[in-house]
Amino acid sequence: MKKKIAILASGSGTNAEKIMSYFENHEIGEVALVLSNKPDAFVLERAGKYNVPTHVFNRERFYNSKEVLDLMIDTGVSLVVLAGFLWLVPTDFIRAFPERMINIHPALLPDYGGKGMYGKYVHEAVIRNQEKESGISIHYVNEVYDDGKIIHQEKCEVKPDDTPESLAQRIHQLEHKFYPLVIEELLQGLD
């Protein structure tokens, strides 16, 4: 039986789409649910392209009710994947999916992580600090932003003439290539 993946996303969903595409006809896993805190997030449209059920929630329903957590449990989700999801995940979610909830971050953690460090803010800080390399970190989710145990990292050079946008392009390429592969590896290790 295929293992089910739930994706939590807040934005356009390019990583989510790469994951949905990768697992569309996969023997090990499938994306069973895409959840978003934004009703106008483009990730919801991308999910429709793959016939993946979606669910939208607000802050109240995410933090003060069991609705979202119960939906994931009732769907039989094995792995929860954060892909551009910008809210801190409640402790009861983390307890329900111990070492089965992961996130991707556009920097080499522990550097450039934490609250407010996402997207262009990360790349601006990396360039401002004249770093020689950046990359991606895939990590387990815990109660602190970008603090969970690192599962996988990939590096890329920060070029002297890089802008936040040019660096972001190379980071996105790493994300799109490696996130589905790491998810596949984790699914293979789950009972």
Question: Which residues does each PLM region occupy?
Answer:
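One-carbon transfer enzymes
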Residues: 1-191
